[in-house]
């Protein structure tokens, strides 16, 4: 469902040095029913995550047996991860910057489909929006 960061962990001496507690605050159960209302923050997050889960379960390239590697994007704020098996090749491109960027990759093996949006594109010099991601995939 998602919730905002909880900085109260800093007030507990046993937790203050461990920033993982930022995401482990008390869950606000009163917001949980909102996941079924499409135009709420909780509904948008719930349905977006459900969509990603469906994508992952529909493609064998997400199996644990797939080969995994990174490719250089020539920008430290952009991460590109390749997953590959005999049937598919997947490139996940993630922009951790607050600015639109170009992932300077040069995969010249065909047209990919962004599994999230359905748009087709080449995996070359990919323009990626601020804090955006693409899940590019192609059949072999």
Residue map of PLM features:
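Loop/helix patches that line or flank the sugar-binding groove of alpha-linked glycan CAZymes
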Residues: 1-90, 96-104
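A broadly conserved detector of short glycine/acidic/proline-rich loop/turn motifs that flank catalytic sites
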Residues: 33, 85, 97, 109, ...
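Compositionally biased, intrinsically disordered low-complexity segments
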Residues: 4, 81, 119, 129-131
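A structural detector for beta-sheet-dominated domains
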Residues: 30, 105-108, 129, 137
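Beta-strand-rich binding/interaction modules
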Residues: 99-117
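Hydrophobic, well-ordered secondary-structure elements that form the walls
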Residues: 52, 91-95, 112, 131, ...
């Amino acid at each position: 469902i998602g919730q905002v960061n909880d900085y109260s962990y800093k007030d507990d001496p046993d937790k203050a040095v461990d920033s993982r507690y930022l995401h482990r605050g008390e869950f606000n159960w009163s917001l949980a029913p909102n996941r079924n209302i499409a135009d709420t923050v909780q509904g948008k997050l719930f349905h977006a995550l459900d969509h990603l889960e469906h994508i992952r379960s529909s493609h064998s390239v997400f199996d644990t047996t797939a080969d995994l590697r990174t490719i250089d994007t020539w920008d430290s704020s952009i991460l590109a991860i390749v997953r590959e098996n005999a049937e598919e090749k997947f490139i996940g491109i993630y922009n951790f910057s607050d600015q639109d960027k170009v992932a300077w990759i040069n995969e010249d093996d065909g047209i990919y489909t962004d599994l999230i949006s359905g748009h087709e594109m080449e995996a070359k010099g990919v323009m990626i929006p601020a804090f955006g991601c693409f899940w590019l995939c192609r059949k072999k």
